[in-house]
A protein has these predicted regions:
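ATP-dependent adenylation/nucleotidyltransferase module used to activate substrates
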Residues: 1-162
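ATP/NTP-dependent adenylation/nucleotidyl-transfer catalytic domains that generate, transfer
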Residues: 4, 160-228
Length: 228
């Protein structure tokens, strides 16, 4: 059985159009924090392939493990606070947040469904990507990366022949992911600016979280930098 890991971004959308005739289904993980644009693209994709939606409780996970961050002071983690004492904000590494709320639930559902091949829109030129490559076997499933050697421009050019390309597909993180994500800060400026313009209500939620995170990071640095 062949499934597509669908995020709503341009790369997984390109894989859908490229391989829809050989796909048995697609799997989308709904964290409860997706943009309206992503929700519409999931609905669109559902007209092309059987869509299995996995719901996760990201809010609960963040309450337990913390706000995701690129920089993680140990004493502000859930484990660190057991030793160093309770902090006003709990922080977790972004990889843990993404794995717990997106990657692991998707893999678990794929295995549950009996998927033997799973298609990802991973590309070599991306800054963040799995160490797995096209043909790798992970969790008993063969990973297929049909656009591994494509550029972002090639993806957009291909999609323009298949659909009306959404304007936000020009954003670096075109899958958008969680609208209040406080990680990937260096690469998220275009997403944050776009959110502020297109969805001021969602931007307000993001800003509240990032201000909490910034204050905690500043406090941790003030505690650890020796200025003797």
């Amino acid at each position: 059985m062949r499934a597509l890991a669908f995020s709503g971004g341009k790369d997984s959308m390109a894989c859908l159009h490229l391989m829809k005739d050989s796909l048995d289904l697609a799997i989308y993980v709904d964290t409860g924090k997706s943009y309206p644009e992503t929700q519409r693209l999931v609905e669109y994709a559902s007209t092309l392939v059987r869509m299995v939606i996995v719901k996760t409780d990201r809010d609960r996970q963040n309450v337990e493990q913390g706000i995701p961050s690129d920089v993680v002071p140990v004493d502000w983690t859930a484990f660190g606070q057991e030793v160093a004492g309770k902090k006003s904000v709990t922080i977790q590494g972004y990889l843990n947040c993404c794995f717990s709320n997106l990657c692991e639930p998707l893999t678990r559902k794929a295995k549950e469904l009996g998927v033997t091949e799973i298609v990802y829109g991973q590309r070599d030129e991306e800054g963040y990507k799995s160490p797995s490559r096209n043909g790798s076997i992970s969790d008993g499933m063969v990973r297929i990366h049909p656009i591994e050697d494509w550029t972002a421009e090639e993806v957009l050019a291909y999609l323009s022949t298949k659909m009306d390309v959404p304007a936000h597909y020009r954003i670096k993180h075109s899958s958008l992911d969680c609208y209040d994500c406080t990680a990937f800060r260096k690469d998220s400026k275009d997403r944050v600016d776009w959110t502020k313009e297109a969805h001021p209500d969602l931007y307000a939620e993001y800003l509240a979280r990032v201000e909490l995170l910034n204050a905690a990071l500043k406090e941790s640095l003030d505690c650890t930098i020796y200025t003797g």
